[in-house]
Amino acid sequence: MTMRTATITEFSSSYRSLPGLLHLLQFGDSALPIGGFSFSNGLESAIQQNLVHDKETLREFTLTAMNQAATSDGIALLTAHRAARADDRGALQVIDKAVFERKLNEETRLMTVRMGRKLCELSASIIDDRLNRDWLECIKTAETPGTHPVSLGLAFAALDVDGRDAFGAQQYGVATTILGAALRLMRVSFMDTQKILLEATSTVAPAYEEIADAGIEDMASFAPMVDILAAVHVKGHVRMFMN
C-alpha cells in the first residue's frame, strides 16, 4: 500500500509539470507558424562576406548571437513576463517601445515586429487570456510596435510558464533559427549543427543567472558587426532570407 501511494504521488507531481513542459516545446518550436523560418539572424550576410565559412565559425556566430540576444531581447522577455503577470499594461508598452528603439536597422525591426504580431495573433486565438487579446488590439491600432520578446513574454505568462523556462525557450529559438538557416546556406551536416546546438544550450543557464534580476534600463546590445551585416543584406541582390 505504501509503495502504491508513493508511486501515485510521484506520478501526480510529474503530471503537474507536464503541461508546462509541453507548452515550452510548442512555443519554443522553430516550426511555430510565426515566420521565423524567413529570417537567418544575419547568417546569410555573414556567409556571403566569408565571416562564417565552416562549422567552427558557425559555432562562434551562434554563441555570439545568443549572448547578444540574452542581454537585449532576453531582458525584454523577462521584464515583459513579470509585467504580464502583474497585469501592468503601461509597463508592457514601455518595454515594447524600448525593444523596438534598440533595433538599429530596418531588417531587425521588421523581424521583431513581424514575428511579434504573428505570435500575438496565434496566442490570442488559442489561449484563453484577455491580456493577450487586448495586446493584439494595441498592435493592430498601432498603440505599440508589438515586438517578439514582449509577445513571447505575454504568451508564457498566460500559460503559467516561469521566467527561467521562458528565457530558455527564447535562447533555444535563437540557436535553432541560425542553425536551421545554416543547413540551407552552407556545407554543414546535421551532426555538426546538433553538436553546436548541444554546446549552445549549455550556456543558457549561466546567461539567465546574469540577467535574471535585470530591468529594462539594463537592456543593451553591442554587436556592430551584426548591424553592418544587416545593412549589407538590405542591398543584397541574391537573398534567400528576409534578414
UniProtKB/Swiss-Prot annotation:
It is found in: Cytoplasm. Keywords: Chaperone, Cytoplasm, Nickel insertion. It comes from the Bacteria. Transmembrane segments: none annotated. GO terms for cellular component: cytoplasm. GO terms for molecular function: nickel cation binding. It holds the Pfam family UreF. InterPro entries: UreF, UreF_sf. Its main location: cytoplasm. UreD, UreF and UreG form a complex that acts as a GTP-hydrolysis-dependent molecular chaperone, activating the urease apoprotein by helping to assemble the nickel containing metallocenter of UreC. The UreE protein probably delivers the nickel. Belongs to the UreF family. Required for maturation of urease via the functional incorporation of the urease nickel metallocenter. This is Urease accessory protein UreF 2. It comes from Brucella abortus (strain 2308). The lineage of its organism: Bacteria, Pseudomonadati, Pseudomonadota, Alphaproteobacteria, Hyphomicrobiales.
